[in-house]
Amino acid sequence: MAAPAQAVVKEKPPIHVYPQAKIGTKIFTHHGIHSMRYNGVCALTGSTVLMASGRFVMFVDVHKGTIESMQGPENGGVGAVAVHPSRQYYVVCERKPSDPAIRAYSWPSRTEVGEFVKGATKGFSACAFNKDGSMMATVGMYPDFFLTVWDWESRGMVLRSKCHNTDVYTVLFSPFDSGLLVSGGAGHIKFWTMANTFTGLKLQGLLGKFGRLEISNVSGFVVLSDGKVISGSESGLIILWEGDLIRCCFAREVDREDDDGTAATFMARSYDYTPCHEGAINVVELMEGGRVLMTAGDDGYFRFWRVSELEVAEGEGAPPLYVPECLGEILVHAGAFIRSVTYCKDVDEWVVLDSAGVLWRVPYVHPDDILNNAVTKPKEQAVPALEFNGGSITSAALSPIDHTVVTGGEDGTIRLVDYVTPRELYKMCLPQPNVVIGLRFFQKDPEKKKFLACCKSGAVLLVKRGSTAFTLLGQWRPHNDGLALFAVDAAEHRLCTIAHGTVFFFTILDDFSSLEPIGFCKIPLPGATCVAWDDASSCCLIGFECGKLLAIRAPTRDMVDQSVSYEFTCNYALVGIRQRKKVEKKQANVSAGEREGFVEEEEEEEYLGPWPVRLICPMADGDFAIGAGGVELLYKYGLHVRYEGQKELPPLPPTGIEPPDYVEEPLMNLCYRDYTPEASSMSYSGRYLVVICEGSQMLLRQLDEMGRVRLEPILVASAHDRLDGPIAAACTSFDDKMLVSVGSDGLVVAQLLDGCIAPQPPSPVAQLQPLRAEEIVEPQLAPFSITEQKDLDDRRRAEDEKRRELNLFLDKLKDVHQKYARLLRENQSLALTHRLSKEEITIHPQIYRELQEEMRQRVEESRKPTALELARENIRTRKMRNRFVDNLAHDRFLVRSFSKEFSVASFRTPYVDGSIKLFQQQIDELLGSERCSSLACDGDRGIVSVASGEASQQSPRNLSLSTAAGVVRWLNSEERKRNEGEQQKMNAAHREAEILTTTMRQYLNKMDERREERHWRKKGYEMLLAHKPDPAVEEASLNEELRRETRRRGECILRTDPSYHSAPSAVIKLQQLIRLEEIIFNMRNNFSNELLKLRDEKERLCGTLNVSLQRIRAINEKLKDKSFHADDVKLTPEEMPGKRFEISRDGLVAFMKQRQEEKLREQTAKKAQRGFGADLATGEPATNTDTSGADTPATRRSEGEDSRKVTISANRDSFGTAAARTRSVRTGTLAASKGGRPFSGGGFAAGAARERMNHELRVKHENIKLTEMEEEELQIERNRLLAERQRLHTQVQAMMDEFDVRLWSMYEERSRVDANLCLAHTHSLLLFREYNILLVFRQKDFELQSSYDEARNSRDRCLREMEELQRLVQDQTASIEKLQEANKVFRREVEIFISNSFPAEHVPYITKVFLRQIKRRKHHSDMSGNDDDITSDDDDDDDMGEDEAWEEICPPNCSEERWCEVIEKREVRLDYVDAITEERRQLEATEQRIEEHKALADKNNAAVSTCLKAIEDFQGEKRKQLNMLETLVAMRCGQVRCLDEEGRCPDTFRRNDLVVVSDKVITGLHDRIRALAEEKHDRRGKLKSMVAEQQALQRERSEKQALHTQWEEKIYEAMLLKFGQIVNLEVLESSCGSREVEQLKERLRLEELSWEKELRKRDKKIAVLREKLHESLEYNTSLLQTIGDQESDRQSVERSLAQSTQKVVSKMYDSINVATEEDRSNLRLLIAAQQEEIDALRTEVALLRTKGGHVYAAAMAAGR
């Protein structure tokens, strides 16, 4: 119960106080659609489709061209919409910051019929129904991405599971089985099944694996009848999925021809292909029964495919490609980007959502026509129904003369929109499509129709608005790209644009017909965010991301010499402003011992900037509105404090007090509570300031005639999506009646201000219908060969036969349908009493179910014989893989060196998820047994505070004083210990003294801090004197040495270190074990990854080397030299262990050959047993010949290829003609023998004769005597080949040696990793021993913690009771004062009454009677024993002891009625007296109880201190036991100094005097200091001499340059006289006379240029990938922060609930307002019911947090 009180104490007061604001606008019209949504259109009835844009649900009639809308949630938007299959309902999925819902509506009444709750955290991104509409699936957006299945009838949640960790675009039920679902989105596709498990029905998902195919976004897919899935991709391929793997990819064309024209090998290879669509495929749908597949994408085409062909296709290559037959295609438009498609049955049309902002109507094509190839020329073309802006609207400018707005968007168009009607009047497409970032009308223009348009490409356009179109007056390009900001001064004479750190200035002509450039300068600071003009100082104000504000003086035309350059020197000044208003910190009402800690904590939590400057808006009175990127940081400034030529504020004086006018303080806050400003604009009339804030929020600030801002802001109604629809621009209309805003959701929203009359729409202007010409498409004939044509004819003939049979069946079916329709019409014509219902007239729906059941049974029967064995094998294989393969991040593999002298092995690295999960379970069990983790955290915090106090009292003798950081730490601890008492006294004096001003307090604090800094800095300099000349360099070097020592030793802080004080527990040790396991895994994994990269590099290197080695072998063959070995290099099986699980075609062929050889050896062995001649009888020689030839074809082929290559080179070089002829003859002989049959006896003799003839021919060729010229040519060629072989051998050897050197470095790294792993395993063993020890102490630790918690709770309860009693004392004192004051007033009134009602002589007597005290019996409610309570009045001093009888007699000549009134008033006075007495008695009793509670609080404080001391002692005992364990510390051999007497290393290292630190380091440091001093002196002398030499060289350089200029002029004249042109003599001298050499050089240059281009492309790709990685990291970080914020919100809600419960209980038993027994019983029942509801909600939340995501709808309903 202490948490709420603590939260109240630490609650910060608000920075600004605002008056209560109300919404002062209402939605009037909106125009546009969100064209970038997937599944953005859904068909309703008729020609109406359902769409969602921003926070509006739209009903679009594509025939009439009208749009009706319904607003979504106020503080969010619409995430997705879907239509029920019955088309009688539709659902709207909300998107809100918290608790989004799914609302179901009926159509066409649009009334809400139901609600689905708790399906997502912030909103939904996709929604779909199953075929019969009984179930609905939704997918949440970030941060949860939950897939939820709902029951439509009960509105309950059926199943739930985490879908993916990225955006999900589409979710889909299978039309054939509602238990199958598919979801797809950013970079993934996932397949879901509703599986029955032993815990019930659950969702099980498989993530699709793209394999070799590039990962793609998937937005369109369908499920086939056999469970396969067909999806689209970004590359334009259609993908067929089976399970979670890709079975086939469909393309329009595949190039299967090899580069060299030979047939492809058995290895899977990649082919070039033409995709099915040019661009992404966004739509994939099945048409009527699943016979035809329709796809559509960004190329604007509909294409149709036969499903029966796709589902059985088998691809070839990697990825597997297949070319299906395209049944037809429909072109929507050449520039269309199809995003979504829906089919309107009532009008028989497709409605297409185009990303360019167009809704198209496409005539529907029947599947029969598609199968009959009748869609080559559609009868009707696609018609645009509605046209809007494509994508986001990035800028807008309102017309100063009428109710229109000019918008610019991402699609590169400028549009004029009438927001009253609303409708688009006309548009202009820019010459170069680009993003329009800003628009502005010229108010000084007489016609007020000219405006500026700035584009992101760097172009500035001057445009004029006409009656029917825009006119481009001119365009300028001051920047190459990246134009982001622009501003026009108030007089509209100057323009400045900003892009990429430069600002360009223009002059605007008086007639606004052109711009004249002045010049540009570079901005001194990066990251410009906003810009505005300061007309008073002729400066351009620029805000930056760093929070600074610069004023750049605008140049004039005379200041820039444009004949030389447009660049001029930037003249700037820093504007000094305080971004947030100063707030005086109030002292919290806490105890004296806790006040200092509270103030320090508040100062740490408070962020003091700087914030990025987001907006600068000039105001009418000359001031500026400046907004920063923080909450409520929008102020009004004068901007008078400036620092010329400065980028930083000047430093403060030594006193720390800001001088006057150091920075400008804010004049007025212009924001509102919890709003963060983003942009602003001023209305044309100057009456309104429009402020755009984060989260699509807006507010208006109204100004009076003098330009002063009124205090009451006006809030603007929500017009755009609060979560995903930022506002790009907003402003009021020319008459200040309307507020128009545009945003990234593509909407133009107009709102009417309260109290204003809506403007009338303009009168329509008749326009001519544009003429459209039909495009003539030239037919193209596809060339076919005779075989292809024959196959095509056969296939068509078979298809025609099938189609004929199908048509016969369809004709019969048509007759049945006609008869059925006739029966329906007859039934409809009957009377209502005789008419059959729809259920009664249904024709045998059981037939379909029986057929489905029969098919299912057949499939099950076919699977039964092998089902058991197959399941066993699958389970066995899965278990083995899970146990030995799948649990490994890296398997062990070797990388051998080329020299074969050494090899490096990787680490067999298993995943650590299992062990970490086991440790986490143990942690959960330990935390669960402690019953309250928060208590443990509080205890740990208390223990840490005690331990820190103990650490401050210990001696720092063990601290390292060898570094500056160690000395600083020691000095700080010494100063804290010495000044602890003085600081307490100073704090007490400060608390008792008067409250100083903020400036004086800061000054005194800074003086104390600086005095303390000077003190310990002086001592530090004395100790660090030996570390001269530069302590910072020495500290850095020593810190680096410490880091190296830490990495080598493993643990920086030893347990014997005095700064090591912890509260060890079993949970902490388990967490340390988890971190250690992750470290070990990372070490293994990182090394294995590096070695894997090296292995892959070796594999690539082998391919490169084999090319050179193959050339060497060819040279050896030419030279006939077999002594020079050049065998191919390849990876061994040990280096590629992963291939043992791969099954390739080459491996199967090799296995088949091996099996054939084994069978052949067995047959040979059997024949050998039959005796001599058995082989001759069965043709054994032929068999042997074939056997030997089995290995020769490849060899022969390679020899043939080599021979052909040699022949070509010989012809080129005129060498080896005879040898080539000889090889060709031999090759032809072998080729002839290769194709023959197995030899018979005659064939064998003929072969022998041919061999003899070949041998004789060979001998004759060899005996031919060559001429001297031929011998010389042969010798030259031999020398050339030897040189080439030597060069190639040297190159190969160098590449091998370089690889071996890198592999050797990996070998050394492996040794280091081995050592680190040994230390890590030893450390893990130490942590496990510590964990076992801490388990023993765990019970006692828990008991001490429990006793501490009890004592602390008692103390807190006592303090709370004391606070309540003190408040009660204050209330009672105030009540007594009120009663006394009322008594005095009443007495004065009675005295006046007596003096006016009785004679003067009787007034004293009657007054005495009135003031007399009499004995009265107390009220019956007072049951005390003292009934005669007599009180005396303070003003009555007379004797009251006379007889009472005469007092009751009315005096003579007095009215009896007045006398009775006096008696009654006396009773009233006595009642006052009794009440005051009773209150005083209660006050005394309360004060007595306070004294008792104070004594009890002292006892509780003593008990808490005793518990803390016991916990501290117990923690010390635990640390002592842990320190008794032996710790392994890794040392270097150079650190072992102690040897025995003989100079040998001792036998054991367990000696105290064995390990010492070397003192050579200190000697080396002294030597280094002296060397540096000498070097410094020498370098100063050298610097002086070099300066003098530089000056002399500069003078000489000037002279040489003048002489060089003269010679250049002479050479120029000489070349003109001699050659007539300028000739490059160096190129002329370097060129040779050979044309072939020049051609080769040119080819080499072109090749190098292509390589450079490829390298630049790769570098750009790497940069893009790095950017994506950085964005993913930021995105995940934001998700973690969001989770933390939500957890904080949940805790605050629980605290508020507990506090409200306490208030209700306190009110129930309040002593002032006592409730009746019935009220108390009712409150008890209410509290009990609320507690039950809270418990049920907590149970539900805990259930939703479970991993499985299973929810029982029945249990939830019962809980409600």
Swiss-Prot record:
The keyword Coiled coil applies. Pfam families: WD40 (PF00400). Keywords: Cell projection, Cilium, Coiled coil, Cytoplasm, Cytoskeleton, Flagellum, Repeat, WD repeat. The keyword Repeat applies. One of its GO terms (cellular component) is motile cilium. One of its GO terms (biological process) is cilium assembly. It is found in: Cell projection, Cilium, Flagellum; Cytoplasm, Cytoskeleton, Flagellum axoneme. Residues 1155-1224, 1420-1444 are annotated as: Disordered. Residues 1348-1389 form a coiled coil. WD repeats lie at residues 119-160, 163-202, 213-251, 276-315, 388-427. Transmembrane segments: none annotated. Residues 1155-1165, 1194-1205 have a biased composition (Basic and acidic residues). Belongs to the CFAP44 family. Residues 1425-1444 have a biased composition (Acidic residues). Its main location: other. Residues 1181-1190 have a biased composition (Polar residues). Flagellar protein involved in flagellum axoneme organization and function. The gene is CFAP44. This is Cilia- and flagella-associated protein 44.
